[in-house]
Amino acid sequence: MDGSGDDYADGDAAAVDDETLAQIRRAGTAVADGELVVYPTETVYGLGADALSTSAVERVFETKGRDRDDPLSLGVTSVDAALAHTRPTSLATAFMRAFLPGPVTVVVEREASVPDALTGGRDRVGIRVPDHPIALAVLEETGPLTATSANVSGTGSVQTAAALDESVRAASAVVIDGGRTGGAESTVVDPAAGTIHRRGA
């Protein structure tokens, strides 16, 4: 990551700030109502919706202008939370326990609870456990979220809430400002296949 220590200090402070906690609670209500939220992670800002709801996932694709064949990842609070919705190999489970939380997305076989809309109909899904206090607090409040950058597809990822595209901001019920993020998107790894799909943070 290229974020400074001061940036992280700001995020840590925001994690216990009363206003941020109130925003996190509002995010929980918004996600339960099928709406979108923007939240900071240790890499870039994420666009979140109920990852287990087809209609909510569709709203993410529409907002980003993203191809439906380009899958989204599943954001959760922990590896154990991921196991409730996936069937990873023992190797993949060990990999997740070694590297998560952190700026890595791990591709594993999904359970039926994960909708086709999230994965583009594929039988595998990327698992993301962010290493950021606000992101984890949001996930604790909401349950599994879409883990995708809060940008319009084809444009750069967003490192500050102020840099959000106006269309993304308008589509989001809650925008949680956690200061500047690290900047590089997560590395995407499929341990079972021995493949790195994207090199990132």
Question: Over which residues does each language-model region extend?
Answer:
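Active-site-adjacent structural elements in enzyme catalytic cores
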Residues: M1-A201
